[in-house]
């Protein structure tokens, strides 16, 4: 890794299935895990602008890793000219072709806002689940975001005639309906698969006192069974019906960007009625369910990134999380100290301290 965040140069060889990154806040622990997440999914849960990921005095940042059976993945972030992705030294025409060999699931303190935060946080969480199961999903999301930008720009272009705008919107509606349908179906399918596993974890975490329901509420009216053609036609019609409202507000009123994922405990919205402890248990259960589902469907466990999350959990939940990870998952864990990690965990871990993490700093 070169020029990424506050890391000038960092080279690591993982010799154990567990890497414990220990050090004070601000030393770059989260940045290391973020780099791994970015290489595996092309996304960062902390930042949406690549320029913020590049060290301030360098023109580019580089992340490279050897994974699996010798696959070399490389992602270069440039201030000018965007990104370049390489696999085994070959420049890829599409960055998306980098997704797949490095499946990873992240769990950080930021995820604790999943229950009480805005709907966008739950959409982003579900999108990360779908992406692990179907890497092609990244292309669908890129197309959706591009279409939304184009529609928004179209409403601001006052110089074109109403006839031209109508023709362009008709074309956009067809594309938007197709992409939206495919995203809706994948999100719904993933949540349906995830729900029974999450319910089992919630029962375990609550001592059998709480029931969990996950409801997918699409930002389009979708009646009947999961079927692409009826849903596509329904979304096209809704887009036409909402045009006046869309023009007035300047934003598209129909589509996956308006989805909500409802989390219910005992039949009541956990966001409104769940205690802080219940919400944390729910997030933990969702993450453990995600880990189990991806392992089950992909045939091998993903890399687990635990970013300073243990400090946010009580000792009981800490222990449950560490036990659930077990010996079958490779994981990178950041923390300010080793407390909470049992002797067995430390014995099977490679421990990276502040000196190794930031060799460019003089640490007394």
Swiss-Prot record:
Q: Which Pfam families match?
A: SMC_N (PF02463)
Q: Supply the InterPro entries for this chain.
A: DNA-binding_RecF, DNA-binding_RecF_CS, P-loop_NTPase, RecF/RecN/SMC_N, RecF_2
Chain positions recorded as ATP binding sites: 23-30
Q: Which GO terms describe its biological process?
A: DNA replication; DNA synthesis involved in DNA repair; double-strand break repair; SOS response
Q: Which family does the record assign?
A: Belongs to the RecF family.
Name the NCBIfam families on file.
recf
Coarse class of the primary localization is cytoplasm
Q: What is this protein called?
A: DNA replication and repair protein RecF
Question: Does the record's keyword annotation contain Repeat?
Answer: no
Keyword Lipid metabolism present in the record's keywords: the answer is no
One term of GO molecular function: single-stranded DNA binding
Annotated organism of origin: Synechococcus sp. (strain CC9605)
Subcellular localization: Cytoplasm
**Keyword tags:** ATP-binding, Cytoplasm, DNA damage, DNA repair, DNA replication, DNA-binding, Nucleotide-binding, SOS response
The encoding gene: recF
Q: What is the role of this chain?
A: The RecF protein is involved in DNA metabolism; it is required for DNA replication and normal SOS inducibility. RecF binds preferentially to single-stranded, linear DNA. It also seems to bind ATP.
Cellular compartments per GO CC = cytoplasm
